[in-house]
Amino acid sequence: VHVDKNKDTIDTHLYGPENPLIKGRGKLATPLKITFLKKENAIELKICGKKYRIREGEYSPWVKVVFKPLPIIKIRGICRFYLKQLNPALELYVTPINIDPEKPALPISHPFIYAVYLAKLIGLYATLGLAEDTWALNEGVIDENAFLKQAYLFFEEREKVFLKALERTPRGLCACVFDTTDRLQHMFFRCLDEKHPANRGREVNKYRDVIKESYQHMDNVVGKVLNRIDDKTLLMVISDHGFAPFRRGVN
């Protein structure tokens, strides 16, 4: 979205989904004010009555946003902002809008209240089916470093959810899907393939160990689980598929 700067501030909007109640009204939007904090190499965001400070190269915490398809109806979501750069021009990335797990507009868990319970227990967390924004990296909207930071923010949330669930499961089955190794192999397997066409003009050596490091993170989770279970508990670590070089596709 192109924005115009007025001295040290920008007044714009954060756009959400299409208005689900009134056809032809376009996308829902909520006001967003951006203030430049030059001495801190940062910006301040003011949105939905709250302020957030972000430094260059950092993500914001989860930001609660409210959209109004009608004056008396509110649709609540959450998102994170990432400050790519301040100069020579502002570049600010925002994740896709996720359903707010504390006040979900649609069922995102079963039972319905479980999503709310988790948010109260560990704080806000990603609710989008594929939370890691792979297309933002594919299309150059964010770089590899920003994608890695995002992936591990979501990884930390998933780990918290799993370990809390494990603590509260004295018997029966406790299962959790960790997406991080999958997402990172999709995006960084090229670094293990010297002939991959996506490597042209892009950094390779710096990210050659990304996949190995993701499995080290998962090994750490396995260690935490082993420390929490007894000899009568069966632990299964299962992969649903593997990876191989993928150089060409048809749109």
Where are these regions (language model features)?
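His/Asp/Glu-rich, glycine-adjacent segments
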Residues: V1-G201
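Conserved acidic
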Residues: F147-Q150, F154, K206-V210, S214, ...
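Extended hydrophobic/aromatic segments used for targeting, binding, or gating
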Residues: M187-R228
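Metal-dependent active-site segment of extracytoplasmic phospho-/sulfohydrolases and closely related
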Residues: E213-N251
